[in-house]
């Protein structure tokens, strides 16, 4: 297997009409934005390309522009945003699992449930569970939830996972996401419904959004997925039949080089081979 190290987006931009770009780990690290990434995406758009930010954020996409702006990422870097929170909210609104839910996650995610017609209740009264992350992601991990999960699994409650990510960066620290809790719930015998990367439905919605933005459908061969998560961004792109550019300076940095900004090609290849995936290339950061 050969996975080239790409010098910049400009070297491959002509092959694509649209980019599905991850947010956390590519555009920012949770505390600071990467200005060169925003510049690269803006240049792609200036050449006629379309950029759809595809995020596993467990909140509506309407919340992200303000957050991105605070990190120095302006709207000039993208055309639109699609989040796993959008897909989760759409599903919850159907009331397929009922109208009474038990929420696991920080209070900042509560607006996910606005205008959905569902009611937050105690674990004992719930008809289903929604997980957006640990209650305190600075300190908690999945094992903190093993005991609380036991009665929920025993009752057969379905868990809706609004963010399939296992971990993300926050500054120089790794924190657990909803996907880590959902994985444990499944391992304990519980049923989980996932929304977001790497699961197929989010890519169908993304294709439809791209078609709306460009006025016509975009061929899969002309769509490039960009992300730092091998198990979400790169795996999801492969499952959807899309090319993927692997950003190694995010959560995989320690696995593929001694320095985040200088990936070792042999280690990148080994890391991807272990995952059974072959992105079209890799780069420490997305630059032009």
Which positions does each model-derived feature cover?
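Asp-based, Mg2+/Mn2+-dependent phosphohydrolase catalytic module
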Residues: 2-23, 28-47, 54-82, 86-288
